[in-house]
């Protein structure tokens, strides 16, 4: 029986660190896209340490109007594509524009109208995760 060679542990660790860095770059590009259009109360939720999480990160914000939501969503897509060359695998909510979801598989962006954000309460649902608020300078 031929022996198979295993990759050294160090290379595997570097690969997973690189992958994590890519997820964080994606999260940061989404945040930049939100900030570009003055999204309100931006938070990111680190879901990596939770069992059965649906992504590594959620990035959440809200806007003043449906037009503002659409503008933020377009900005996110533009920033992510320009910086990383990625497009969302799936998106929802463009028709009603009360909650637009952009799914990049490892990072999911949520752009809400304020009342819908309060109603669905994603921060409450994932309260056992690490939640970070992004300071606003506008």
Enumerate the predicted regions with their spans.
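A common structural junction motif
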Residues: 78-82, 130
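A short, glycine/Asx- and small/polar-enriched loop/turn
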Residues: 52-56, 103-106
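Short hydrophobic/aromatic beta-strand micro-patches
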Residues: 60-62
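Short amphipathic alpha-helices in soluble, non-transmembrane regions
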Residues: 72-77
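Long, contiguous binding/interaction regions
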Residues: 1-50, 64-71, 86, 92-94, ...
């Amino acid at each position: 029986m031929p022996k198979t060679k295993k990759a050294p542990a160090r290379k595997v660790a570097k690969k997973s660190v690189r992958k994590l860095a890519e997820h964080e770059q994606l999260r940061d590009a989404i945040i930049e896209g939100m900030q570009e259009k003055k999204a309100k109360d931006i938070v990111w939720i680190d879901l990596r340490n939770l069992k059965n999480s649906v992504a590594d990160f959620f990035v959440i914000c809200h806007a003043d109007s449906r037009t503002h939501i659409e503008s933020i969503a377009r900005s996110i897509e533009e920033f992510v594509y320009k910086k990383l060359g990625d497009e969302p695998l799936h998106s929802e909510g463009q028709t009603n524009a009360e909650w637009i979801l952009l799914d990049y598989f490892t990072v999911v962006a949520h752009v809400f109208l304020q009342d819908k954000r309060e109603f669905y309460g994603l921060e409450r649902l994932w309260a056992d995760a690490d939640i970070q608020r992004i300071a606003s300078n506008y």
